[in-house]
A protein has these predicted regions:
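Charged interaction segments
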Residues: 23-116
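Short, extreme N-terminal segment that most often corresponds to the first beta-strand
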Residues: 1-25
């Protein structure tokens, strides 16, 4: 079964060409983004042409080729634009396994609550 996470990635319209170029060079990244994502909002996430991808219960391991290509894509986005151009949020199975990267899309965040 393995350890699974819920992940959201959003990027600005300015970052989309970098995303598409990276996906064009990596079949694994293309599959991750355009086949494996449970939800895709392509150009219509906000009124500015941003993209959003949402994966639920995904094995998000740095050693996987798709994740390596994804991380390289993020590096290119930061290099060409900056960290305001994206937001990546990952919630793991463990209560303290939460990660947030990028400074764009501040309305995407982790919310904890008590359920009963």
């Amino acid at each position: 079964m393995g350890y699974r996470s819920d992940v959201i990635f959003a990027c600005t319209a300015d970052a989309v060409p970098t995303l598409l170029a990276a996906a064009g060079k990596s079949a694994a990244l293309q599959e991750l983004l355009f086949a494996d994502a449970d939800e895709q909002l392509l150009g219509d996430y906000d009124s500015h042409g941003s993209y959003l991808f949402h994966w639920t219960s995904i094995k998000w391991y740095d050693g996987y080729p798709a994740i390596q290509a994804f991380n390289q894509m993020i590096e290119k986005i930061v290099e060409k634009l900056d960290e305001e151009a994206y937001r990546w949020v990952c919630v793991g199975e463990e209560m303290d396994d939460n990660e947030i990267e990028g400074f764009g899309f501040e309305h995407i965040y982790i919310s904890r609550e008590i359920a009963y």
